Amino acid sequence: MKNLKKFAFLAILLCLFIPAVSISQTNPAPPAMPTQQNKIIVDKIIEAAHYKTYVVDYCLTKINEASAKEGWNDQKAMEITESINYKNFRDAIYNIFAFYDEVELETLLKAYEKDTAYQTTNIMTTNKVLLNNLDIFARDIVKGKYISK
C-alpha cells in the first residue's frame, strides 16, 4: 500500500512537471519574403503594373463607400484617407513573390514593361490570396486602425 502511494505521488509529479518543462507549441514561422535582390525586381514589377495606384484607389473606393453609408463628416473622411500608406501593405505583395527566382521575376518584369494589356490582368489582380489581403487591409483602414494618434 505504501509503494502504491509512492507511485501515485510520482505519477502526479510527472504529470505536473513534464508539461511545464517541455515546449508543446512554437511560434509560427515568419511569412516568406523574397531576397533583397528580388525585392528590387518586385518593386519594379509593382511600378510597371501600377499596382501601388491600384491599392490606393481600392482603399479610396472602400472609404468613399463607408463614408456615404455611415454619413461621415469631411474631417473623418479626410483623416481616414490620409491614413492610407502603401508601405503597410507592401509585405503582402512581397510574400506572393517569395517563391519566384530571379530569372522568373525578370521575365515577369519584361512582360509587364512590354505589354500594356498584360498590366490590367496581372497576377496581382487575379491572385485570390492577395485580393483577400487587400480587402482586409482596406477594411482596417476604414475602421481607422492605421490612424496615427
What is the meaning of each model-derived region?
Residues K2-L10:
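Bacterial N-terminal signal peptides that target proteins for export
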Residues L10-P19:
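Bacterial N-terminal signal peptides
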Residues N27-E79:
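Early exported N-terminus immediately downstream of N-terminal targeting peptides
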Residues K6, C15, S148-K149:
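Extended, non-catalytic scaffold segments that flank or surround catalytic motifs
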Residues L14, K52-T53, K87-N88:
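Short secondary-structure junctions and interdomain/linker hinges
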